[in-house]
Amino acid sequence: RANSALPIAGRYRIIDFVLSCMANSGITNIGVATEANYSSLMDHIKSGKPWDLDRKNWGLNILPPNLEKVSYGSIKGNIDILAGISDFIHRSQQTYVILSLGNSIYNIDFEEVVKNHIESQADVTILYKDMKGMPEREISRFTTLELDKENRITDIEVQPYYPKSSMASMDVYVMEKALLESIVDECSARGDRDFVKDALVKKMTGLRIYGYEYTGYTDKIDSLKAYYRNNMNFLNSDIRRELFNSKNPIYTKTKDQSPTKYGSDASVQNSFISDGCVIEGTVINSVLSRGVKVAKGAVIKNSIIMQDSVIEEDVELSHVVFDKEVVITKGRKLIGQESYPLAISKGTKI
């Protein structure tokens, strides 16, 4: 499945964050561009009702690859994806466009971002987070930015091995629709594929590209390690309060299931337990999606267990990530590490 459709924090999907931020900011015309393996994503967002985007005009649009404009096998960069949805962009009547990855975690008011973009008279605004104090290997996962005193971007490095700056791009861009169309047309004509390297970097002297600093919690889910870490971070009450707040709520597709049942011997500590689970064993510092069954004597620590998995009696799990419908039979012991969690694919029986 697409990264943006992965379950996170038990009951949510990763894409819920960006969709909710846009909906909370009054954005009513949203297109979700897909590339491959998007059936679970389509099933999750459907008409957009949880985000109040099931509208007669505009609303939420799922945009599979346009194979008339870009052949499926030739999609090699985000310029190809944008070219494939150029009809949607052209038909949109809004002046400004916000581009964001669907696998990012944040909770931001885009109204403030657009207001700042207009006031600074920027051609392009890039959201960024100062990751000062983070290890270089973590910062190098991101595109890094150098800025002057006026917050104008003077240099861009795409995932540098030795980053010169701690200012990490969130891969969120604001610009006028007309400028985006011009960039996509020009890059497509030249055979350029990458929006940052082939468009923004090459146009830095000709465009006013500014940064907008975001000071809240953010990350992108680009690896198993990042997926595991972010799920575990949600167990931190400070991070949870920051991301899941009543002022800017995170919406998701709701499921009608019975409440979780806890047996007389069940023990749960600092965990997310979704509806429909049956807990008769021990769950510590873990995230369980809907319908997970944990039998008596089983112990789950520091793990992520997805929908409808079954953990039988006397199983011991630590630092594991299970996809949907995994079955672990009686007495098994599976131990991963925090830096290398053990991943088990959908439907596996061990």
Residue ranges of predicted features:
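Unchanged
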Residues: 1-233, 344-346
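Left-handed beta-helix
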Residues: 178, 186-350
